[in-house]
Swiss-Prot record:
It catalyses: 2-formamido-N(1)-(5-O-phospho-beta-D-ribosyl)acetamidine + ATP = 5-amino-1-(5-phospho-beta-D-ribosyl)imidazole + ADP + phosphate + H(+). Keywords: ATP-binding, Cytoplasm, Ligase, Nucleotide-binding, Purine biosynthesis. NCBIfam families: purM. GO terms for biological process: 'de novo' IMP biosynthetic process; adenine biosynthetic process; purine nucleotide biosynthetic process. GO terms for molecular function: ATP binding; phosphoribosylamine-glycine ligase activity; phosphoribosylformylglycinamidine cyclo-ligase activity. SUPFAM superfamilies: PurM C-terminal domain-like, PurM N-terminal domain-like. This is Phosphoribosylformylglycinamidine cyclo-ligase. Pfam families: AIRS, AIRS_C. Pathway: Purine metabolism; IMP biosynthesis via de novo pathway; 5-amino-1-(5-phospho-D-ribosyl)imidazole from N(2)-formyl-N(1)-(5-phospho-D-ribosyl)glycinamide: step 2/2.
Length: 350
């Protein structure tokens, strides 16, 4: 049995580190006020009738897989996806991005491949890449790290924080394209350390390890913005399902409980990781998206409209759960958490 912590990633410790860092950042300009969003998906500052929204993220250890496969033409899509998918979670439209590339050494050919992916991601997200920084740091970095920061914009009266999420609302899940850009440390440990596979070896269902792990993260910008702008849909909450899985729903409203009891069958990649690594169900749902990359919370009567828009963009979607005031699990009252029903048991995501 292997866990994410065994692979070197301790989510609980990361939470503590983030809180420690944020606790020391107290300065605020008096003339340009930040939006009070707490630990949401993105940050924002007031700009007239608008909020300017900023979000930053990177590709993480997926870059190690790209180096193993010597294939870098899609990691730019991943970086942009991780940023823009976060920005839209407060209803903002991404408009521009700057990238940060840190390397020990890089060839022109690899740089071209990365640029190709960045361009494809920019096209899919409908944003401008307006600049960036390339840092050559041979004493610090052995490989390549790719990150970026996105700028987005939303009218003040149109920001979506999740405060209106209430019991009775439904959770519509939009399918992921695969592993996306989270949980790669655990996936690599399972495939390469435990199963002793090579990057080009085939998995039990025919795809190679490289094909599965380098499948680009799905970009949800266009369908989600269409949902937000549809006057017949009241979007109450939006969640990018990344590291930590459905526990991210708590960012929207931690006064209610999110009951996920109608998930589609997990994608083959997740079943393969679980089988080869003997990974417990609980650990799978704390680490991976398990086939759902984005959640939209709406009134029950709006669910089919959301699904129809997702399908228009060739994204499978379905109602995967609902919002409740509380839930009783094994005699305990659960409030302010996500609970997943899977294999006839309840998994509580703290």
């Amino acid at each position: 049995m292997v866990t994410y912590k065994d692979a070197g990633v301790d989510i609980s410790h990361e939470d503590k580190v983030i809180k420690a860092l944020v606790s020391q950042i107290t300065f605020k300009r008096s003339d340009i006020k930040p939006a009070e969003l707490g630990l949401h998906y993105a940050g924002a500052v007031e700009f007239g009738d608008y909020y300017l929204v900023l979000s930053t993220d990177g590709v993480g250890s997926k870059m190690i897989v790209a180096e193993m496969a010597n294939k870098f033409d899609t990691v730019g899509i991943d970086m942009i996806a991780m940023n823009v998918n976060d920005a839209i979670c407060i209803g903002a439209e991404p408009i521009a991005l700057v990238d940060y590339l840190a390397v020990g050494h890089i060839t022109e050919e690899i740089a071209e491949q990365i640029g190709k992916g960045l361009n494809e991601g920019a096209k899919e997200a409908n944003i401008n890449i307006v600049g960036g920084e390339t840092a050559t740091l041979p004493d610090m970095i052995k490989g390549i790290d790719l990150a970026g920061t996105v700028l987005a914009i939303v009218k003040k009266d149109e920001i979506i924080t999740g405060k209106d999420v209430k019991a009775g609302d439904v959770i519509v899940g939009l399918r992921s394209s695969g592993i996306h850009s989270n949980g790669l440390s655990l996936a690599r440990k399972v495939f390469f350390d435990i199963a002793k596979l090579d990057i080009n070896d085939k998995l039990s269902y025919g795809k190679t390890v490289a094909e599965e792990l380098l499948t680009p993260t799905r970009i949800y910008v266009k369908p989600v913005l269409e949902m937000i702008r549809d006057k017949d849909i009241e979007v109450k909450g939006l969640a990018h399902i990344t590291g930590g899985s459905f526990r991210k729903l708590k960012r929207l409203n931690d006064k209610v409980t999110y009951y996920i009891d109608n998930l589609p069958e997990p994608l083959p990649i997740f079943k393969e990781i679980q089988r080869l690594g003997n990974v417990p169900d609980e650990e799978m749902f704390r680490t991976f998206n398990m086939g759902i990359g984005f959640c939209v919370i709406v009134d029950e009567e709006d669910a089919n409209k959301v699904i129809k828009i997702a399908n228009k963009y060739n994204i499978p979607a379905q109602v995967i759960g609902r919002v409740v005031d509380s839930l009783e699990v094994n005699g305990n009252k659960i409030v302010g958490k996500a609970v997943v029903k899977y294999n006839d048991k309840h998994i509580i995501l703290e």
